[in-house]
């Protein structure tokens, strides 16, 4: 008699579990918010990112643009083309060397990651004219900026104005001729 009662309880439990299982949405957290791990609350930009910009998402989850030429222009495959696009995007480099800008480069569309570490060999250098970031949510990594004095004036090699969530990581900025 006791075995029948235990069996009946087990069957009832299984039926109840099978009935309730579809009601719980997939991916639903069973932990209250205050018990969730720090990882689920705060996703950092990249391993080792620190400081106020560490949660910048850049182009995460967006389109990937490949820089396939060192030329400066608005044709597909150039850095300028990739930076002029809108929406979340990551720029990777299939070439290494120096991109000699024909004019200043203004980054005005945010949600952007420029992954200089993706370049082969010695990486990428941006030269001749300044680069200015005027957009939110931008990550720039592993690039060299060498503006020099070819373009005239006293430019900064890399600058930013009126932007939030900006990370400049492992970049070298030199040969600027401003405010000496």
Region annotations inferred by a language model:
Residues 13-23:
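Bacterial N-terminal signal peptides
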Residues 2-14:
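Bacterial N-terminal signal peptides that target proteins for export
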Residues 35, 44-91:
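Acidic Gly/Asp/Thr-rich repetitive segments characteristic of extracellular carbohydrate-active
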Residues 26-28, 32:
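Boundary at the C-terminal end of the N-terminal hydrophobic targeting segment
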């Amino acid at each position: 008699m006791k075995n029948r009662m235990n069996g009946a309880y087990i069957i009832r439990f299984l039926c109840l579990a099978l009935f309730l299982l579809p009601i719980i949405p997939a991916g639903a957290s069973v932990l209250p918010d205050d018990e969730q791990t720090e990882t689920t609350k705060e996703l950092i930009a990249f391993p080792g990112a620190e400081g106020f910009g560490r949660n910048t998402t850049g182009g995460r989850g967006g389109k990937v643009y490949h820089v396939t030429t060192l030329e400066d222009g608005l044709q597909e495959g150039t850095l300028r083309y990739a930076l002029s696009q809108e929406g979340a995007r990551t720029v990777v480099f299939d070439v290494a060397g120096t991109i000699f800008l024909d004019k200043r480069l203004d980054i005005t569309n945010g949600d952007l990651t420029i992954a200089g570490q993706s370049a082969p060999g010695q990486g990428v250098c941006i030269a001749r004219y300044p680069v200015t970031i005027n957009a939110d949510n931008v990550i720039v990594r592993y690039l060299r900026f060498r503006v020099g004095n070819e373009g005239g004036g006293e430019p900064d090699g890399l600058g930013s104005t009126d932007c939030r969530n900006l990370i400049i990581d492992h970049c070298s900025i030199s040969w600027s001729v401003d405010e000496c």
